[in-house]
Amino acid sequence: MALVLILQLLTLWPLCHTDITPSVPPASYHPKPWLGAQPATVVTPGVNVTLRCRAPQPAWRFGLFKPGEIAPLLFRDVSSELAEFFLEEVTPAQGGIYRCCYRRPDWGPGVWSQPSDVLELLVTEELPRPSLVALPGPVVGPGANVSLRCAGRLRNMSFVLYREGVAAPLQYRHSAQPWADFTLLGARAPGTYSCYYHTPSAPYVLSQRSEVLVISWEGEGPEARPASSAPGMQAPGPPPSDPGAQAPSLSSFRPRGLVLQPLLPQTQDSWDPAPPPSDPGV
């Protein structure tokens, strides 16, 4: 009996082995699926994340892969175009790059679709500190306009500009690029500025505040110092909500090491949460 069982296992092993060691055909054969993350690709530790793999045609089996691993990290056997992979209470160790593939039973052993585009999951308490620079430079001629660029490391983030002595955010931009530009009119450009960025939706993850940047008239000379030592500068407040939307709970986006100050009720004079493209700045 034991000999029969061993022979059966040896017979099944090639089929099982080829199923977890995928053979990828040319792209024209089986188009790649789409891989997305809910609630976001950037989350804080402890959040439940769902990775969704959507195939362009009904499939039978889906596999979730990480680079350097031959076998799928997770399997889902579903007779549909969508499979969900659940990552509960994620940790920083679960961050990284993911891809997914799908296959059908009539494709033969080990044949999978083209892999999806890369999805990078970032699990962190706070985002890296951005840089703040002036274009063309921090020393401007009288009446000249200046552009401030707040640059982070991630695309599709929301950027906030602060000015020393002003409690409310000065300008707010959402950018598909890993940076955002803020235009200051020459007559009001001189001053001390800092910026930060955050994920555009809850659960919010905030960056550290940038170092301050001093804009001055020619002959005055700029100076730079850490934002934490700048008088009148507060730690980043919570991301402003969309007009008409309920502001998220402050505790839902409190990053480690930051003391968040709630935003005061905003007026058109103090804050425009979504300046139009033609807005010349402050």
UniProtKB/Swiss-Prot annotation:
InterPro entries: Ig-like_dom_sf, Ig-like_fold, Ig-like_Receptors_ImmuneReg, Ig_sub. Residues 1-18 form the signal peptide. Disulfide bonds join C53-C100. Residues 22-116, 126-219 form the Ig-like domain. One of its GO terms (biological process) is immune response-regulating signaling pathway. Belongs to the leukocyte receptor complex/polymeric immunoglobulin receptor (PIR/LRC) family. SUPFAM superfamilies: Immunoglobulin (SSF48726). Residues 273-282 have a biased composition (Pro residues). GO terms for cellular component: extracellular exosome; extracellular region; plasma membrane; specific granule lumen; tertiary granule lumen. It comes from the Eukaryota. One of its GO terms (molecular function) is collagen receptor activity. Gene3D superfamilies: Immunoglobulins. Keywords: Cell membrane, Disulfide bond, Glycoprotein, Immunoglobulin domain, Membrane, Receptor, Repeat, Secreted, Signal, Transmembrane, Transmembrane helix. Regulator of osteoclastogenesis which plays an important bone-specific function in osteoclast differentiation. Residues 221-282 are annotated as: Disordered. Glycans are attached at N48, N145. It comes from Homo sapiens. This is Osteoclast-associated immunoglobulin-like receptor. SMART domains: IG (SM00409).
